[in-house]
Amino acid sequence: MNKSIFYRFAVTLAFGLLAAMPVYAGGGGWLIKPLGLMLGGAMVITIILTWLKQANILSFIIMGIVMGLALGLQTSGLADHESHYPGMASILSGFQEIGIILVMFMAGVNFNLKDITKRLGFIISNGVGFIGLGLLFFYWAATRFAGTEGFSESIFFALCLVVPSSFLVSASLQYREDEDSLHGQIATGTTVIGTLLAVVLLAKLQATGGLDSGASSAVSNLWLTEQILLLVVIVMLISKFILEPVVRYLLRSSELLFISAVGYCMGIAAICGALGISPEAGAFFAGISLGSLPYRLDIEDKVGPLKSFGAILLFLTLGVNMSDLDGSLYSNNVGVIITLTLLVVIIKPIIVIITGSLPNIKSRTAVLGGVTTNQASEITIIIALLAWKAGVFSDEIFAILISVSLLSFILSALGQWAQFSLFNGFKGMLHFMDRNPSAFEITRDHGMEMKDHVVLLAYNEVSYEVAEYYQQKGEKVLMIDTDPEIIRHFQAQKESNIVPLYADIMDSSIWSEFKFDQAKLVVSCRGLLQMNIELSDFLRQKSPDLPFVAVTTSHEDALELYDNNVRYVVQTDYMASKSFRDVFAKEIDKPGAESFGDSGSQHWKDTRAIRDNLGEIFKLV
């Protein structure tokens, strides 16, 4: 972690100094010293915030505020310092615009349509429900607590609070390796839908300065929609017929790809600005066109510093803007800020629980999804900033909104760190989401006794192989999963030997109800370390001779599981390497034209067979 922080600091410092060189040459050398001090201070604060498990963007906002206070911006505006700091207002405004464009571009690069197309109906129902209910609630909260006036001010205020942060959602899921979990897919899909809505309204804000009603507004909205659709079509055509071969060539050099990505981003943004379309929306869709290429992971790796650099420019200058406001706008609205922050942090998980209860997701999934998305977004901070500059937000509304957004980042990060403790504290109130069939019902409906049975926790390739083995022996297996789509699939497979049970595999009452201690084999196919340790302890106390097998992707977790009396650990990399060793020994001595051909063909057939057997849920496994 420390190496990553120092590397990012070095890269961003180099970019900052490079950007400041023309200013220095033009007589603006006063900028380099404070810029270096700000970035150095931000590095120290970032290390502290990382230790406190907070988003590092807060460090740049803090240093921006410190810079503004040092300049005395609370008592005088930027224009009053022109004589001593020539061009400062223009330079900071330019830095901010560059930061906004780069953040929007990288948001587009990281935008993955597969996040919503994998479970299109499920994600859309939850995501649209979340955004819709959130807009209604926070529209009311904006008028009730913040005192917004008019439709434009209230709806933009609500939008800025309802859309989750792609930065924080992605970081949280990656840290816990939950990207492919059901709650991770719900959180990511909701963020994707909210981001799309935010970009569309951002384009509307840039085009007309707000949201009006009437016939003229309907015509302008129609024209704006046509412009956005045309922009999307053009960048997608560029992506398919021009970018793909160009990027394939540029991947040979990280420097070429980096410079070309910056040029492409700024070029599309400039063209959109000249045509009257939002440059920010243009940069976002340019990022999508680049991120949709087959080389997405390579592109993200090589142009990743753009994200950090853009965030630094944006949030440093945002801090300066915040310090430019009258301090009384913050102090006089402390109660409003705290109230709205608590509403964001508390109400958004409740909305996920409400929307999640319709497709019958389990309480743990709903709570974890809600805790992951209960913050404002960096993109909506951009909207708030632009709305303030466009006159849609007053100084007071802007001060309230930015304060609420930043406080929601802090509280949300703390909540994500303690998300399992939060769930355990509130799960007693959510029993209505967790009604499970009893062991008696499973025995009655499927003829499966809860003794000497096989238990599979979660469904994936490992459980597929175990189930196939017992199907050949004519035995049924009990498969427990929290994914409603997988459960519905096996409920429809009347001839399958898999008996599906829709339940929370981390709920210890399930272990007793379905008599895990009387099973002949328990296989945990999810790499949930703490749950597997607790289940191992439960089985060791109840039935020490029962074989318990667990799956993990981590070597460290494998050793810890063995230390906690798990009988056998399927460490996927280890198993893959051992399996490949056998294939390697079998194929390597064949002539080059035949080497690995038979094994590859057999692997292709086996994978196709799995896909054909699983049908629609193949992409979910």
Where are these predicted regions, by residue range?
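Transmembrane helical cores of multi-pass secondary ion antiporters/exchangers
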Residues: 1-440, 444-445, 449-450, 454-457, ...
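Cytosolic regulatory regions of ion transport systems
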Residues: 186-187, 268, 352, 361-365, ...
